[in-house]
């Protein structure tokens, strides 16, 4: 056992003495030691109950002949960190989470790992850390919350509250309606109820085979979710010493491809591109941002979920057959594009896992021949504005897929929010928010507040927004993020001026500023990088090491 390094032989008597202080007995030193990586924190609705979930898991591990050791990572709620300097810390927290998993698991030489993530950066951070450790690993998330319901009987989610801010600013809803939306949107614990970043990543864990069926869709705080926890705990005990189930044997090139196929079919958050690039790097497998359009061109978009379709939420997907039903439909109808021989954590191939899966409600999960779109729900655009690519959630587009407009430029998200409220962005404009990339922010803030303001003010179908920052999974509209190279590293987005004409063609995968090479060259000569004070030592360190979004915004020592 790997854990023999801390428990076997007379030289390890001091180690055992310390372990005995934690309650271990002689017989425990012959059992596998399993790390239980929790992410319990009171301030996140998807995490405040995870201490109870960890107890269920630890009890089941003990019943099955292993010794659990719980430890915790940090967690940030992007919704609570939104709209102030706290959002600068969201993406960097992914690196802290990954580092903490690696540090604890390797410092104590634990044999296997079960991770309990749920929201935002916690799932990708845990995946990255687990891949560095490379022991048998299983993921079981806390689960999504139920959708909210207003007094009028309308189903809503957190994105509805963000959009209500814009509607209230524009005097389109009353104060009473505004308060009702605020108080109704998040009715219970769990990750936010739509296909936002948390649920997208927990769904992709299922698609990659590192989590059991239902991981992405079974509601939090349900008996069914508790049974999933027990199943996961039993399974980690079964495979704790089996090298076939080391995480790098599960998250392979095939698994990463399967994840991106499911992402396209379900219209996942644009953040998944950022995270999967980082995860694939830790797994040692190739994923180039340029490959994603090819995958998208081969995969129909068959499940549209809030915020793209406000009548469908994660619990609806679960009742309609779940992620497995989506994968089974794609597999049977689209030329076996899925890698069906990929190994899953149960020991089954993906093909075996899907053999009994079927769509139970075709109004929720559509057949391929009745798909929302013949291509996937994400796209990568290229052009002189994004030579290394940028990302758009095509599933969330509500207006035209071709757009030409005059730039209205802002050098920060805060500046953009103030400008939008003052009416500086009008119908037909392209709202440009720059110096918000991984280096420029630093930290690559989410632009949910500006996009939600535009949507709530009735401009969502008539304005494009482009940024070197990123978007919440709750964003919809013609919102293009992750522009690389970013403004802070000399990208063309930093050279734009108010009134410059920008052309976007989603179906042609292009984004272009109509500027001559002569004009661009002249602007580069005149360009002076704006200086931004970064008081945080951690963020300054992050700024120096982080790559741009086209590489996953990873800390790069090379």
From Swiss-Prot:
Reaction(s) this enzyme catalyzes, per UniProt: (2R)-2,3-dihydroxy-3-methylbutanoate = 3-methyl-2-oxobutanoate + H2O; (2R,3R)-2,3-dihydroxy-3-methylpentanoate = (S)-3-methyl-2-oxopentanoate + H2O
Residues bound to [2Fe-2S] cluster: 119, 192
Q: Name one GO molecular function term.
A: magnesium ion binding
Cite the Gene3D superfamilies for this sequence.
IlvD/EDD C-terminal domain-like
Binding positions for Mg(2+) per the UniProt entry: 78, 120-121, 446
Q: Which residues carry this modification: N6-carboxylysine?
A: 121
Task: Name the InterPro entries for this protein.
Answer: Dihydro-acid_dehy_C (IPR042096), DihydroxyA_deHydtase (IPR004404), DiOHA_6PGluconate_deHydtase_CS (IPR020558), ILV_EDD_C (IPR056740), ILV_EDD_N (IPR000581), IlvD/EDD_N (IPR037237)
- Catalytic residues (positions): 472 (proton acceptor)
Q: Which GO terms describe its cellular component?
A: cytosol
Keyword terms of this UniProt record:
2Fe-2S, Amino-acid biosynthesis, Branched-chain amino acid biosynthesis, Iron, Iron-sulfur, Lyase, Magnesium, Metal-binding
Lineage top rank: taxon:
Bacteria
Q: Name one Pfam family in it.
A: ILV_EDD_C
Q: Summarize the subunit comment.
A: Homodimer.
What name does UniProt use for this protein?
Dihydroxy-acid dehydratase
Name of the encoding gene: ilvD
